[in-house]
Design a protein with these regions (language model features):
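C-terminal "cap" of GNAT-fold acetyltransferases
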Residues: 143-160
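Conserved acetyl-CoA-binding loop-helix of GNAT-fold acetyltransferases
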Residues: 87, 93-106, 133
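Conserved GNAT acetyl-CoA-binding A-motif
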Residues: 108-120
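A short beta-loop-alpha structural element at the N-terminal edge
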Residues: 1-13
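Conserved active-site alpha-helix within GNAT-family acetyltransferase domains
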Residues: 121-140
Length: 160
């Protein structure tokens, strides 16, 4: 079941997020709360009353200190930015990530590109393949994390 996040979910989200490092950046509960306040969409996926995945989406009006978000702010006047999609390891490849994205794609946010980034270094080939299967293409690459990471900046270009 997909539902809006609540502050009572933060501990589960922190665990899911920490378990997914280095494919996502570390964030603490105060950052989760800030993202929650600014998000256009922040939902969790529950399986048998356990939060097993989440999706955070911001729009161009967010105040977010991220090189990747800043890249899209410079490129587009309006856009949606997928800050992160995280699925618990034991629930991956079961359609949960696809369900979260389908939920996002069916909402009407007007004619805005949907954007995200995926790590190239450290490599995350499963996420690249997943995003390509959801209609995303790489439009650029950039170094982040003081040059320790390289990301593919992606945009969704087709309806699935």
């Amino acid at each position: 079941m997909i539902r809006p996040v609540t502050p009572s979910d933060y501990n589960a989200l922190l665990k899911l997020n920490s378990d997914s490092i280095p494919h996502v950046n570390f964030i603490n509960s105060s950052i989760f709360a800030d993202l929650h306040r600014q998000s256009t969409l922040f939902v969790v996926y529950e399986h048998e009353e356990e939060v097993v995945a989440f999706l955070i989406v911001l729009d161009e009006t967010a105040s977010y200190d991220s090189l990747n978000f800043a890249y899209f702010q410079k490129k587009f006047s309006k856009f949606l930015y997928i800050d992160r999609i995280v699925v618990a390891e034991r629930f991956r490849r079961k359609g949960i990530g696809q369900s979260l994205y389908h939920f996002l794609f069916t909402l009407d946010y007007g004619p805005r590109p949907i954007t995200c980034e995926v790590n190239l270094d450290p490599p995350n080939p499963k996420s690249i393949s997943f995003h390509e299967a959801q209609g995303f293409i790489s439009i650029d690459e950039q170094l982040t994390g003081k040059g320790r990471k390289k990301v593919s900046l992606m945009m969704r270009v087709k309806e699935m």
